[in-house]
Amino acid sequence: YFNAAIKIDPRDYRAHHNMGNLFVEINDYQKALQSFTNAFDCDNNFLDSKKRMGEVYQWMYQENYDQTNLKKSEECFLEILEKKPDDVSSLTLLALVKLWEGDIDESESLLQKVHKHQYENQENLNKNIARILSNKKLLATLIKHEYEQLTHIDNDIDEIRNPKFTKEYYDKLKKYAERIKNNSLEGNDISIDFMKNILKPLYNKAPKNIKKNLINTKIDISNIESKYNQIQPEIVVIDDFLTDEALRDIQKYCRNANIFKYPYEFGYVGAFLTKGMSNKFFLKLSEDMRLTYGNIFKKHKLTQAWIFKYDNQKIGTKVHADQASINVNFWIAPNDSNLDSESGGLVIWNKLPPKNWKFSDYNSVSAASKINEFLESENVDKITIPHKENRCVIFNSKLFHKTDDFSFKNSYIHRRINVTLLFD
């Protein structure tokens, strides 16, 4: 069809672009590049094709680690940003390129621009507000965490100075939190101005102690690497994963960083690489992991990261698989938060998604029932790894997995928290 369109009009840039997307689907990157190049040559204001070229060069780099492809990817995104400086996806992808090149400072700068866009760009802000106000569960989850966190900060337990919130704002939060308890809060009770305030980070001071390795090297790393590489499927559990100092720093950061603005229906809130975690601490942490466990990560690089903070009266993340080669999942809640030391961690099944499944078939809340039926019908083995403070699980990210059932103390400082980083 697209070939026919191109024969009729060789300058049909959309036909060239769509042809490129078809080649991407079958992993024919050279032909995809040619099609996207043709599209851009037909109309050099059609930046989508230049962006796709940058993405394809990234994928080619991840296949063969040829630095030339990484450099070409960088050139594509820089060209786009010259014409469209606030293009979020180009800023994000360029930030990954800079991280993969080892330039943490520039990667941080780019990611912070993206994060700022999340709460300052009016169109993006309006979409997020509409999404939350239209879903009572999301609204309750966001307000409950915000109120608990600001109460914690206001009590000055962690000596956080100059919090940027007023008594009026805090009193409104308190009133809404009380209404959540009796299930009487509705989306139309909340003003747009209040939502703009709640979605703006009030405090986000990252840990500064990053000169030393953040990963504990006083354990048998070579033995851990051997276990990971010898076991099928690839799963290894590491206790005492972070250094003591790094653990305390990240615990304090997660208690106080006002970045958890992405609520989920089941009661947990999230922050992501481009949405709050855009700082040198996490970028350095990802590099320290990769370099310390070189025989696990090999040449794989960070592609995404998030932190989830759970409501201890609700459930965790449902069964899914992630689109990456390696998943790093570690837990930072203190051991005395967990009321059942044999649970609360991670369940992993020895099964990858069928090759004909789309991403949404294995990575969406709505797909959980289908996945469970599939795993039961196949009688797939699973392992359960209990929660423990400073315990890390590294595994093949494409394996189906979910949060184990958990029973934690019901207070803010005892919330179950997991940090996830994906490498590809």
Task: List each model region and its residues.
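Fe(II)/2-oxoglutarate oxygenase catalytic core
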Residues: 100-102, 107-108, 112-392, 398-424
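Helix-start (N-cap) detector for alpha-helical repeat units in TPR-like alpha-solenoids
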Residues: 13-14, 47-48, 88-89
